[in-house]
Structures are given as C-alpha cells and as structure tokens.
C-alpha cells in the first residue's frame, strides 16, 4: 500500500501547477498518503507549495549549461550536492515513489531515486521534452505526456493535469458558454456586452507579449 510520495518539479508555473494538481488529487483520493514536494528556494514552488499546504524540501538549483563554459567544471560538484539533498528528502519522507514534472530539481530527484531503487514516474507538460525528463524517462516506471507528438519512448498520453478549480471552469463553460462568459466579465469588472481580448504567455515569452500589447493597446 502506498504511504508516501515525493513530487519533484519547479522553477516555473508550467512545472509547479501540474505538480500541485496531482498533489491535490492524491490528497483527495488517498488521504492517508503522505505528500512531500521537492523544489528549490528560488523557484515559484517556494511560495506556491507552502501556500497550498504541502511540505517543501529543497535542493540546490543546478542548471545544465547549454554551451561550453566554466560552469561545466562546477557542474559535477553542484549536481552531486543536489543528488545528496534529493536523497535525504526521499529517505526522510519515506517516499515509495518519485513523481517528476521536469525542471532543474527533477534530475537530482531521478538520480537519487534510481540509486535507492525507488520507482520513478514522469509527466512531461511540453510538446518537446526537457533535458531532465529525457534523462529520467530512460529508467522511469511510467511516463505520461500531454501531447501525442511528444517524443518519449513508451509514453502514455494523459493530457495536462489541471487543478479542480480550473477543470470546474472548463465544465462551466461547456455547460453554458454565454452564462460563463457573462459571469467572468462581471467578476473582472468588465462590460459583458463588449468584446474581451485575453493575451497570455508563459515564462520568458510573456515579457515580449506584454511589451507588444502595451505598445499596440491604443490601436486595438
């Protein structure tokens, strides 16, 4: 019987939100299971995870250099420290499975779990898998992806885990789109009779979108 699970992921909301959605579902369906989240002090998880009510264990942030630089020489030592910290989190929590969502924290979590013979389960949110999940997928017990086109061997398409609050909004709109739109406009203080343009973007791309839309606001 599953008693403890460690969820690893962080850095951006793209990793943290699906992680929290899974954590919430585990807590709802298996209230006896202990849930620990593994992240970093620098990522969004440092705020989002505790505010959601889950304990957060941290590891040092170890970005993988994409180009040859002095950082390559520091990588082995930094990665070793992160793997040790991830291993301590697995041991102290008694985790029987590690579920990873990608990001800097997932690589040391996967490596520490492998050393201990703890099963690894992976979810990849993006169409193009990140380095951590490409590595972990080599020995993961199961791999889930959002998109059918994601190139990870043996992956099962599950879609993107959504928090129940978000799923409820989707269901509300499907049931009555007009009423859902009117309700949302009123909550945001907008005129329901006027067109509404929503512009959204993630991570670094959001800044470019914000600047472009701000510059074009008068014309729009």
Explain the meaning of each model-derived region:
Residues 15-27:
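Short amphipathic alpha-helix
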Residues 43, 48-52, 171, 178-220:
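Donor-nucleotide binding loops and adjacent catalytic segments primarily
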Residues 7, 37-38, 122, 145, ...:
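Structural beta-sheet core signal
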Residues 114-182, 187:
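Active-site-proximal region of nucleotide-activated glycan assembly enzymes
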Residues 2-13, 32-83, 158:
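Conserved nucleotide-sugar phosphate-binding/catalytic loop shared by glycosyltransferases and other
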Residues 85-98, 106-121, 134-139:
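Glycosyltransferases and closely related glycan-assembly transferases
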């Amino acid at each position: 019987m599953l008693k403890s699970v460690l969820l690893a992921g962080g850095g951006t909301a793209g990793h943290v939100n699906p992680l929290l959605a899974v954590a919430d579902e585990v807590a709802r369906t298996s209230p006896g299971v202990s849930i620990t989240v593994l992240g970093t002090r620098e990522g969004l998880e440092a705020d989002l995870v505790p505010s959601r009510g889950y304990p957060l264990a941290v590891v040092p942030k170890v970005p993988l250099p994409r180009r040859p630089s002095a950082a390559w020489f520091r990588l082995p030592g930094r990665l070793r420290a992160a793997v040790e910290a991830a291993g301590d989190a697995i041991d102290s929590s008694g985790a029987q499975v590690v579920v990873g969502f990608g990001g800097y924290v997932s690589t040391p979590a996967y490596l520490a779990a492998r050393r201990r013979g703890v099963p690894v389960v992976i979810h990849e949110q993006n169409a193009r898998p990140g380095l951590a999940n490409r590595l972990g997928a080599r020995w993961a017990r199961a791999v889930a992806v959002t998109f059918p086109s994601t190139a990870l061997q043996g992956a099962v398409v599950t879609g993107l885990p959504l928090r129940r609050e978000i799923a409820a909004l989707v269901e509300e709109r499907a049931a009555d789109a007009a009423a859902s739109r009117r309700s949302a406009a009123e909550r945001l203080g907008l005129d329901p009779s006027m067109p509404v343009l929503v512009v959204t973007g993630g991570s670094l791309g959001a800044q470019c979108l914000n600047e472009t839309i701000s510059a074009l606001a008068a014309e729009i």
